[in-house]
């Protein structure tokens, strides 16, 4: 029992380290994007966003390989699903960023890009963290570290007004403060038609 507990704690500590590394990388990219916006180098912003997502994905793969070894490495089918998700996310990001450039003045663009960055760029890491820790560890709710109480501004409207969903796999955020209103990992519903 003690060995199992120690192993779970080790996995928890490892996931915290990898999460901090991912968030630090996102912060670095955020600084780079702010600089690119100031220089109006909008084409390079898309590359920076994609680079951020891809590196988050690579960190998750490295985490699985180093922590659990090749025997417990995700199946090939799961790797293909990850790659498909990467491309889908990139295409979705391109659409969102293009839309941000077409709307409003520079302040509006900066706000929209900032929101996209803080959500979309970490979605791959968050999704991977929950799926991996749910499979290997009982501390998934701790390892994710995504849930928080809504702010006063959100509570005032009961979490129902001025709330936006930014990204398919992410919780709703207030567009101004971007706090998490409510977060419950989404579960894929079984298709009754397929099971019939």
Task: Go through each PLM region and give its residues.
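N-terminal leader/targeting and assembly helices and adjacent pre-domain segments
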Residues: 1-129, 135-136, 185-196
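Aromatic/histidine-rich interaction motifs
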Residues: 133-163
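Processing junctions and N-termini across compartments
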Residues: 111, 145-148, 173
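C-terminal edge-of-domain segments
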Residues: 154, 167-186
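Generic recognition of flexible, low-complexity loop/linker segments
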Residues: 129, 165-168
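Compositionally biased, intrinsically disordered/low-complexity regions enriched for serine, proline
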Residues: 71, 147, 168-169
